[in-house]
Each structure stands twice: as C-alpha cells, then as structure tokens.
C-alpha cells in the first residue's frame, strides 16, 4: 500500500492532465489514500492493475475516449459503489474478455460486494457473462445503441428490479436474465428478433412480461412455445414463474400450436 504526499500533506484527489493518453500498468496500484481521480477525455488505454488496491474510491467515471481496459485494472477497489464505463470488459465490442469481472480481476461476480450501480455509455453489445453473478447490483444502465445481449449476460443479478432494454437490441442470448429474482415487470422491445433458450429462467417473481413475439424467433421458424424462454427442467416441464399473470404480445405474425399450453397461472394475454 502507498500514499501520495505534497509538502507532507496527504493527497486524496488527483486530476490527471488533459495531455495524458495512456495510464500504464500498476500506475496507481495500492494508493489507498486516493478517494477521487479525474481521468481526462484524451485517455485511450488503461493498463493492467492500474488502480488495483485503491480502496478509497467510491465512485469512478471512465471517459468515452477509452478503448481498452487492462486485466484487474480495478482489482481490490472494495469500497467502490458506482462506476461509469464506456463498455463492459477489455475492449469496446471486443470478442473476448467482455465481462465486468475482467476489469475487477475476479470470476463470477466475486468483486466489489459494495458495487451497486454500473452505467455503460458506449459499445454495441453486452457480451456473454457481462454482469453474471453480480448479485449486489441494483442499477445497470445500458446505452441506446446496443444491438445484442449475450449468453448469461445478467445471470443471477438478483438485486436488479428493473432494466430498460433499448429498442436497438436485436438478439437476447440463452440464460441472459436467468436467476434475476428481483424482476416483477419486463418489457422486451419490438426490435428484438430472437430470444435464447431459458433467457428468463429463474425469474421467479415475474408478474408481467411484454414480448415482441412468442417463442424463440420473430419469424416463427424456431421453437414457438411460450415456455421456451423460461427453460425446462426434469422436475417441472413448464418452468413458467408461478406469479406470472399478464403477457402482452406486441408483434409477430402467428401464435404457434399449443403456444401457451400448461400456462395455468396466466390470467391475461394480449
């Protein structure tokens, strides 16, 4: 652990000059006295473990200029409550390391247990396992230009009670929201053309859902069962939440054979 001093005075706030374009690996690692740092809009890369162990941070804003963030860049920032990011993972729209855990240097959400809010300001996709296992998150905001939500992207985000899915999203991956027990009402926009298997499995407190179609795909060529998006299990063939009462369908050209079979708890279908 380290601290920064100026004339024997502990520095708790730091403004990085606007001329800086790169923050190197371990640049501020272990500076436990820092409570606030302002990163200029010119910065394009943040290195591995750049801010690791900065336990004084509560809120962080990473500017949109940043295009890459190193592994474990914020590892050990255990008091962090909110972070604003230009994308999720290592690189904007990168094919690998697209999870929040990558920048926190941990797996399956075992990072900052105090983290409550994540605001994503850029990128066109939310990758597979992006927020998976972050049970303490209560607020996640994704940008309007996102077109895909990956496999298990929000799996087990039990603290989430609401998520606004922008009407630019076209695909939602398998198990994308499975285990999100905080959801009571969900609205899937008309822009979505495919929904993966068990995308909403384990959303046990869901009371209403609005969908652009019934089943897996808008064109009706794949599975057309309403239960498909809730998954199946060996002990319960139709894994639909017991409290689900209202289903609103806003699009699609047909309702498939036996689409709502064994959906006894639903009282309203529009």
Label every PLM stretch briefly.
Residues 1-270:
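Solvent-exposed loop and capping/linker segments of extracellular ligand-binding repeat ectodomains
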């Amino acid at each position: 652990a380290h601290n920064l001093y100026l004339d024997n005075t502990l520095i708790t706030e730091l403004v990085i000059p606007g001329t800086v374009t790169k923050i190197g690996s371990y640049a501020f690692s272990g500076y436990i006295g820092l409570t606030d740092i302002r990163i200029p809009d010119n910065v394009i890369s943040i290195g591995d473990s750049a801010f690791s162990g900065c336990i004084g941070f509560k809120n962080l804003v990473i500017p949109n200029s940043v295009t890459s963030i190193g592994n474990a860049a914020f590892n050990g920032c255990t008091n962090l409550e909110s972070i604003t990011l230009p994308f999720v993972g290592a690189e904007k729209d990168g094919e690998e390391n697209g999870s929040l855990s990558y920048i926190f240097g941990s797996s399956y959400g075992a990072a900052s247990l105090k983290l409550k809010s994540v605001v994503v300001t850029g990128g066109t996709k939310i990758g597979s396992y992006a927020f998976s296992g972050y049970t303490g998150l209560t607020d996640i905001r994704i940008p309007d230009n996102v077109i895909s939500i990956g496999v298990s992207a929000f799996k087990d985000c039990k603290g989430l009670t609401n998520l606004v899915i922008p009407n630019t999203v076209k695909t939602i991956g398998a198990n994308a929201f499975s285990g999100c027990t905080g959801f009571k009402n969900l609205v899937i926009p008309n822009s979505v053309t495919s929904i993966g298997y068990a995308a909403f499995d384990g959303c046990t407190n869901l009371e209403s859902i609005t969908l652009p179609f019934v089943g897996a795909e808008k064109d009706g060529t794949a599975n057309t069962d309403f239960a498909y998006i809730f998954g199946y299990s060996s002990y319960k063939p139709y894994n639909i939440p017991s409290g689900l009462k209202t289903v609103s369908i806003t699009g699609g050209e047909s309702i498939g054979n036996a689409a709502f079979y064994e959906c006894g708890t639903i009282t309203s279908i529009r």
